[in-house]
């Protein structure tokens, strides 16, 4: 707000800044509409990341001065980022008609944060977390993933991918027979 306010007050005129709020595909519009008077003083402001309908009163009898109205405090940076993520996810899911979301949960911090955003955006009843452990997955990761889902009240499934891996390796066995098993085989053999 401060940067926009500074830019606008150099014009020596009252300014009403109106911004939409909501997510549209990969974009998130923060809302936060406001009005400043000719001296650069904030007259009216709306909260960011929620729909708001602030009232701006223009006194036409006195050189279009703005009457003081309701103002809100700006969000802290971390709160603004959180609200942007929540709003973007909620609008993306809802506007595309999805019933909810399913996400892979590893037990790590990145998927835990994603799960928390999803639960906040959609409600715990519209989110399902799936842990897909493999032979190298630590039991602590499985336990952490389950605890994260339980803490947020999200449905949790533990589906091992071991049998999928074995089926995949069996399917490729003839193509790669006689070659050493390593990560570069797929590139050198092609």
Which residue stretches match the model-derived regions?
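Single conserved hydrophobic/aromatic residue that forms the stacking wall/gate
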Residues: 1-6, 10, 189
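Short glycine/serine/threonine/alanine-rich loop segments
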Residues: 13, 98, 154
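C-terminal beta-strand edge segments of enzyme domains
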Residues: 14-86
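Structured core elements
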Residues: 17, 28, 34-35, 42-43, ...
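A conserved beta-strand->alpha-helix junction
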Residues: 50-57, 126-131, 135-182
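Glycine- and acidic
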Residues: 67-76, 98-103, 130, 178-183
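Phosphate/ATP-binding catalytic cores across multiple sugar-kinase/actin-like superfamilies
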Residues: 80-102
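ATP-dependent adenylation/pyrophosphate-handling site
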Residues: 99-105, 109-146
């Amino acid at each position: 707000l401060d940067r926009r306010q500074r830019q606008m007050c150099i014009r020596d005129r009252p300014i009403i800044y109106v911004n939409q709020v909501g997510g549209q595909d990969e974009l998130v519009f923060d809302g936060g509409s406001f009005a400043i008077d000719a001296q650069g003083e904030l007259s009216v402001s709306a909260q960011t990341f929620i729909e708001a309908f602030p009232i701006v009163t223009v006194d036409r009898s006195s050189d279009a001065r703005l009457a003081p109205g309701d103002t809100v405090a700006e969000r802290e940076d971390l709160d603004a980022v959180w609200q942007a993520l929540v709003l973007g996810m909620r609008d993306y899911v809802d506007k595309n008609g999805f019933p909810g979301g399913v996400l892979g949960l590893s037990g790590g911090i990145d998927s835990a944060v994603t799960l928390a955003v999803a639960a906040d955006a959609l409600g715990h009843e519209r989110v399902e977390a799936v842990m897909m452990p493999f032979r190298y997955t630590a039991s602590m990761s499985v336990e952490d993933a389950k605890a994260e889902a339980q803490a947020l009240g999200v449905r949790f499934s533990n589906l091992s991918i071991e049998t999928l891996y074995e089926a995949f390796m069996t399917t490729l066995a003839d193509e790669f027979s006689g070659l050493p098993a390593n990560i570069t085989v797929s590139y050198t053999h092609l």
